[in-house]
Structure formats: C-alpha cells, structure tokens
Regions:
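C-terminal output helix
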Residues: 89-91, 105-118, 161
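Conserved acidic segment of CheY-like receiver
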Residues: 3-17, 22-26, 39, 54, ...
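Basic, Lys/Arg-enriched C-terminal extension of HTH/homeodomain DNA-binding domains
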Residues: 177-201
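Receiver (REC) domain active-site loop signature in two-component systems and cognate sites
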Residues: 60
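Active-site residues of response regulator receiver
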Residues: 57, 85
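Active-site beta3 strand of CheY-like receiver
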Residues: 49-55
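Acidic catalytic/metal-coordinating carboxylates
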Residues: 37-38, 64-70
Length: 201
C-alpha cells in the first residue's frame, strides 16, 4: 500500500475480540485498519513508508509490546505508538512513553478519547513525514554544514573543518534554511532535535 491510500492504523493485540472491536470502532470512524495477532505478524506486514500509527498491547505472548517498540527503534522506524494497558501495567506504560511512545490508554478505555488520540498520532506522523521529506531535499554538503551548525560551530570553524570558504558556508547555510523553511539558527536546531521519535503534544 502506498501513501496515496492514506494513513493506516495498525492494531496489534493477541485478544481476538478486542482486535475485532477496535477494527470496527476505527473503521466506523473512517480509518483504514490492519489488525495483527502479535508483534511478529506486525513486523511481517509493516511497511515503513506507509503513514500511520500503531495501537499496541503492552503484554502479548512471544514478543511483547515493549520488545516490539525496541525493535522498531532499532530498525529506525518512528511510527507513533499508543500502548493499550491493563491497570497493573501503568508503570510499564509510563516507561514506554519515556522511551518514545506517543501515549498509553488503560483498559477499559473511552472510545471517543481513543479516537482523538489516534487522530493526534496520525497528525504527528504526517508532520514528521513532511519534515523528513524536507531533509531529503538537502545536498550531502548542506547536510554536513547543517550538522555542524546544529553542533554550535561558527561559520569560520565550519569553513576550516570542511576546507571551504566562509562565503560557501554562508551559501550552504542559506540553502539549508530555505529548504527547511526556517528563518533562524534557533528554529533550525529545534527542527533537527524534533526529528526524533514522535512524542505526544
């Protein structure tokens, strides 16, 4: 499936009744849904280029939700994750959010609140993908200059490190800021820092 098909909400839970219930709720709200019985099945079907979010049970047989979160991070995938948790798993879910998960919901959850969370997660995923597309437009030299600017280097230091003139550094810096749509070094630094894992608003 391509981005032209719209974002996809993945539901990963070993409880078939809950999976079916979530699929019905999400499809009723107009979302496209892919439901999987476990983490392994999700990994076999997940397409990183497809926009979306992941509704994930924290405790499952085989690979747990937390282990799947770690595996996705290891593979460099930044899909927003909303963990589904029982009351006793709240400390575990809080830890998952600290490690980059978007949010967690406790069972039994409010359907309307869950739909709002999913809409927020999809909006953040779309924005992250837009930012990533802007970064893709940078040349390799512009990326080098950008990384050194973000590291706090001055133009003359960047010029010396890359064996180019200060004027060339300034031209690359101007190109970076134009392509990324920022108008200050502070905004550039913030944009680069925000390119990590999606977090809740």
């Amino acid at each position: 499936m391509t981005d032209l098909d719209g974002p996809l909400v993945y539901v990963v839970d070993d409880d078939a009744a809950l999976r079916d219930s979530l699929r019905w709720l999400l499809e009723s709200a107009g979302h496209r849904v892919a439901a999987c019985a476990g983490a392994e099945a999700f990994l076999a079907t997940y397409a990183a280029e497809q926009g979306g979010c992941l509704l994930l049970d924290i405790r499952m047989p085989g690979m747990s939700g937390l282990e799947l979160q770690d595996e996705l991070k290891r593979r460099g995938h930044a899909i927003p994750i909303i963990f589904i948790t029982g009351h006793g798993d709240v400390p575990m879910a809080v830890n998952a959010v600290k490690k980059g998960a978007f949010e967690f919901v406790e069972k039994p959850f409010n359907a309307q609140a869950l739909l709002v969370l999913i809409d927020n997660a999809l909006a953040i995923d779309a924005e992250t993908r837009r930012r990533a597309a802007r970064f893709e437009r940078l040349t390799s030299r512009e990326r080098e200059v950008m990384e050194l600017i973000v590291a706090g280097k001055r133009n003359q230091d960047i010029a010396a490190e890359l064996s180019i003139t200060i004027k060339t550094v300034e031209a690359h810096r101007s190109g970076v800021m134009r392509k990324l749509g920022v108008d200050s070094i502070a905004a550039l630094v913030k944009l680069v820092q925000n390119m990590g894992a999606p977090r809740r608003k």
